[in-house]
Amino acid sequence: AQSLDFLNRNLEIEKEPIVVGFDVSGAAGDIKTVSCVSFNSDGPDKTKYRFFRVPADIANSDLDSLVFGVKKYLKSIGDVDLLLIDGGKTHMNYVKEHLHEDIECIAVSKGAKRKYGLETLHTRHGSYDFRNSEDISKLFLDIRDEAHRFALKNYRTKKTKDLKQHFLLDVKGVGPKIVQKIYKEFKS
């Protein structure tokens, strides 16, 4: 209720919004994924969780990767009232600049000491320190943390799968069909 009051006062969102959190995971020169988690008035809606593997040509840019993920999510799901970006004002402004839709966008950035609870919420109307606004911190930090957890989980899964496939395909006499049979046999 307090978070909804904040949204009403500061972002003119008058109903229980569908908030989608985005996070980018991956290292430079490696696979990169964008995760998307959806929250409604009942909490997380895992049926709308998605992650997207970022194409290699834009994977070196977190900002372009983020825009790629947001656009892909909006195209496939589309049911969004508020975008929450794990990043700062730069991330928020870059996403807004590259979207051709009228969807509210906010961002959560870590504080100077990167301690939990010292984050800042960025909106088009200004920035708010979480330590001074207990009413907004729980909801937005929960969404940010869930997006981060989901991003890391999927990044690690993809990375492990890529390593396994790469290793098996390097074995003499083992091709894609044998690899598929091995995965099917061991259900992994």
Regions found by a protein language model. Name each.
Residues 1-188:
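Acidic, glycine-enriched active-site microenvironments
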